[in-house]
């Protein structure tokens, strides 16, 4: 997972994390920091690998086997909120901005054209994943929701997503999550 380490060490990636932190310093609700992105990566990987779909995902996306597929999933999770600070500054959709911003980071990390396409499509889709969205984009969207620590949040009752999040969590406990396949 050398390429994942290169993402973590990328100066622009680190700068985006800092800018996200600056913009969210006084935010009461969930933050879009490295820990959140790492959790989304892990949940996304577990969702795909846990269903035995890693080989199928790799083949469908034209990726170099299970290792390549794993790196694509982790890279998408680590980069999915890279453009969040831009949304605060300009109102631009952070998913679409992030898809563009992630490309040079991925190139510097050594990802190939097909891999970059799969990752940037997923990042662009992760906010409003639905019909026509990529499989990985739908997985990221759900993992993004499942990563939120609503149960321990002091302001959860003021959060516009709280009821939805509780529904998603309850459905995940009973194995009836929305279809991401």
Give residue ranges: language-model regions:
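Metal-dependent phosphohydrolase cores
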Residues: 1-181
């Amino acid at each position: 997972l050398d390429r994942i380490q290169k993402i973590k060490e990328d100066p622009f990636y680190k700068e985006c994390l800092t800018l996200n932190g600056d913009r969210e310093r006084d935010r009461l609700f969930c933050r879009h920091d490295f820990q959140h992105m790492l959790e989304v990566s892990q949940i996304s990987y577990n969702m795909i690998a846990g269903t035995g779909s890693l080989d199928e995902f790799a083949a469908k996306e034209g990726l170099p086997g299970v290792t390549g597929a794993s790196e694509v999933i982790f890279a998408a999770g680590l980069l999915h909120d890279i453009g969040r600070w831009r949304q605060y500054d300009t109102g631009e959709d952070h998913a679409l901005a992030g898809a563009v911003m992630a490309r040079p980071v991925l190139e510097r990390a050594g990802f190939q054209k097909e891999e970059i396409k799969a990752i940037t499509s997923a990042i662009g889709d992760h906010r409003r994943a639905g019909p026509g969205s990529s499989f990985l984009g739908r997985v990221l969207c759900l993992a993004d929701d499942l990563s939120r620590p609503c149960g321990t949040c002091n302001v959860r009752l003021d959060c516009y997503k709280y009821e939805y999040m509780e529904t998603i969590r309850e459905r995940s406990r009973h194995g009836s999550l929305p279809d991401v396949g």
